[in-house]
């Protein structure tokens, strides 16, 4: 476009697209509508990828996990007000889990919104977003688009990663500027996530504590997986001989079948250890805040490696805090521990005996006949376990209560950043969004193991998966209920609040053009899984399991408050 003086012009749409591209963003996930529909169209016209979802929350979850896998911000695009609010849930999820993400939302006109005159989808979105992310920006001028996007990228990935909100008022897109000036304004931040080198005395203190430990363990969190310094972490573990425990999304950072893995005896390892080395893991509710019977009677000493200084001492005193990026910290710690004796053989031997015993028990459960003759979690997930061991490049998405807990315990992972689950909040609804992003980012097949209740939060995105013909196989653990499917009704004519229809989810997939299967036995599940993944097409396996399978609230039943007085 040119003006009367023959100066070539560009507009807000094009400058925003150019700014995103300059910052290596080539994919967006979102839901189109006023005022951003044409932005999505023009993004596609420019040759970039746009995955159009049925609900903004799931588009946001896709962006969040894309950020985790790739180590750069995943980008979600939404409409204003209600659509923006749907996206904020996933923005908060990204921030809580330390995933780099940028939420871009169109918004109504500032001069009307600020006077609360009732504009279309009126909302002060920038300030609504602020408590739920690392930073919240609004771009009012076309000239500020390049610096606004660059700041969002740097903020999302620097230090502890997280979500960033960028507000895009509708009038911004129609503003114009000369192409020459726009090109001068475009830039990419230099070294947006610089190494943060830990202090020498912090490394020395941590090394001394580890050298003097009698029963050390290493706890690997998803922060360690995000750091993508897999070889350094593996070398630290193997050079020290210290047993390790992976949190859910750290499974596969070292293979779950590694001889130093103590995952099969986690409770014993935590209760008996005297020093715990936390690498990219937080002492939050997932680790019982470092206290209680989980951690035994003996006072523990902690080494904690984290890029955020105020994470230290958040629940327990940290004897050796190491503030810095994980790659730098682990590298320096290896040097400080060079030549030190390996972990005590009596301690590692005791753990190995426990691991071997527990693995034998689990193997028996995976092959045992059930009293009802129906599948349960053990024998059905045993099929998934064997398949994943033979196909370690597949991404495994997992959510639910019992479906989450049992899959994490039973299905071994051999490669990093392949297990994608509910994360720090234990949130339901991440499933189908994660599937879309994992397939888009890796270009490889994805398997999702879903509780039937959890699947309900994002099930309509089956249409999205089919529309883009993604190689996703969804397995629904169908016991017909939240937790269980056989809770008695409280009274005649009143359906239990935990009951679900034991439905034909396979037919949902077929309604959108995918392939559906019903599996009633492990053999049927195995055959369906092999055929589905080999097809490279969208597939869903309706795995019918015993309604009595499962326990209320999975392994966190203690968090479910019960009445002290009972029924009146």
Curated annotation (Swiss-Prot):
Phylogenetic placement of the source organism: Bacteria, Pseudomonadati, Pseudomonadota, Betaproteobacteria, Burkholderiales
Name the job this protein performs.
Involved in the catabolism of oxalate and in the adapatation to low pH via the induction of the oxalate-dependent acid tolerance response (ATR). Essential enzyme for the bacterium survival, as it relies on oxalic acid as its sole source of energy. Catalyzes the decarboxylation of oxalyl-CoA to yield carbon dioxide and formyl-CoA.
- UniProt superkingdom: Bacteria
| Outcome following mutation: residue 121 to A | 2-fold reduction in the affinity binding and strong reduction in the catalytic efficiency for oxalyl-CoA
* Effect on the protein upon substituting residue 121 to Q: Slight increase of the affinity binding and strong reduction in the catalytic efficiency for oxalyl-CoA
Per its record, how is this protein called by name?
A: Oxalyl-CoA decarboxylase
Q: Give the record's cofactor note, including how many are bound.
A: Binds 1 metal ion per subunit.
What organism does the UniProt record list as the source?
A: Oxalobacter formigenes
Q: Which GO terms describe its biological process?
A: fatty acid alpha-oxidation; oxalate catabolic process
Name the UniProt key words of this record, in alphabetical order: Decarboxylase, Lyase, Magnesium, Metal-binding, Nucleotide-binding, Thiamine pyrophosphate
Catalytic activity, reaction form: oxalyl-CoA + H(+) = formyl-CoA + CO2
């Amino acid at each position: 476009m040119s003006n009367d003086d023959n100066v070539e012009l560009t507009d807000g749409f094009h400058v925003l697209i150019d700014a995103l591209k300059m910052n290596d963003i080539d994919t967006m996930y979102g839901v189109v509508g006023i005022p951003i529909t044409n932005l999505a169209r023009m993004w596609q016209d420019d040759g970039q990828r746009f995955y159009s979802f049925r609900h903004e929350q799931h588009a946001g979850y896709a962006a969040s996990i894309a950020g985790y896998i790739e180590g750069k911000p995943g980008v979600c695009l939404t409409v204003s007000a209600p659509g923006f609010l749907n996206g904020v849930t996933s923005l908060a999820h990204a921030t809580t889990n330390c995933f780099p993400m940028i939420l871009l939302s169109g918004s109504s006109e500032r001069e009307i919104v600020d006077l609360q005159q009732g504009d279309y989808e009126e909302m002060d979105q920038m300030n609504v977003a602020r408590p739920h992310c690392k930073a919240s920006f609004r771009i009012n001028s076309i000239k500020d688009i390049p610096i606004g996007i660059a700041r969002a990228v740097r903020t999302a990935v620097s230090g502890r990663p997280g979500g960033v909100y960028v507000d895009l008022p509708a009038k911004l897109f129609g503003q114009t500027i000369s192409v020459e000036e726009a090109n001068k304004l475009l830039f990419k931040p230099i070294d947006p996530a610089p190494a943060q080198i830990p202090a020498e005395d912090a490394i020395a203190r941590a090394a001394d504590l580890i050298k003097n430990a009698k029963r050390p363990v290493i706890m690997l969190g998803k922060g360690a997986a995000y750091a993508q310094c897999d070889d350094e972490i593996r070398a630290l573990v193997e050079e020290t001989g210290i047993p390790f425990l992976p949190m859910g999304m750290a499974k596969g950072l070292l293979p779950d079948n590694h001889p130093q893995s103590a995952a099969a005896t986690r409770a014993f390892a935590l209760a008996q250890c005297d020093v715990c080395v936390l690498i990219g893991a937080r002492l939050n509710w997932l680790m019982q805040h470092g206290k209680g019977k989980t951690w035994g009677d003996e006072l523990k000493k902690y080494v904690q490696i984290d890029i955020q200084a105020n994470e230290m001492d958040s629940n327990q005193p940290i004897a050796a805090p190491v503030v810095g990026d994980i790659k730098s910290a682990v590298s320096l710690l290896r040097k400080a521990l060079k030549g030190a004796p390996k972990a005590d053989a009596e301690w590692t031997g005791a753990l190995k005996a426990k691991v071997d015993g527990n693995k034998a028990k689990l193997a028996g459960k995976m092959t045992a006949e059930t009293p009802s003759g129906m599948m349960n979690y053990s024998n059905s997930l045993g099929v998934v376990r064997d398949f994943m061991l033979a196909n370690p490049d597949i991404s495994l998405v997992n959510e639910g209560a019992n479906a989450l807990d049992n899959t994490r315990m039973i299905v071994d992972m051999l490669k990093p950043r392949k297990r994608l689950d509910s994360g720090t909040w234990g949130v339901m609804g991440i499933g189908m969004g994660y599937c879309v992003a994992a397939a888009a980012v890796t270009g490889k097949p994805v398997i999702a193991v879903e509780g039937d209740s959890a699947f309900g939060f994002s099930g309509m995105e089956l249409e999205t998966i089919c529309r883009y013909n993604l190689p996703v196989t969804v397995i629904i653990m169908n016991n017909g209920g939240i937790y269980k499917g056989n809770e008695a009704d409280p009274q005649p004519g009143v359906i239990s609040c935990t009951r679900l229809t034991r439905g034909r989810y396979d037919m949902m997939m077929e309604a959108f053009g995918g392939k559906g299967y019903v599996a009633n036995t492990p053999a049927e599940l195995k055959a369906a899984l092999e055929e589905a993944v080999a097809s490279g097409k969208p597939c869903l396996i309706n795995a019918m399991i015993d309604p009595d399978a499962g326990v209320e609230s999975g392994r966190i039943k203690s968090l479910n408050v019960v009445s002290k007085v009972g029924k009146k």
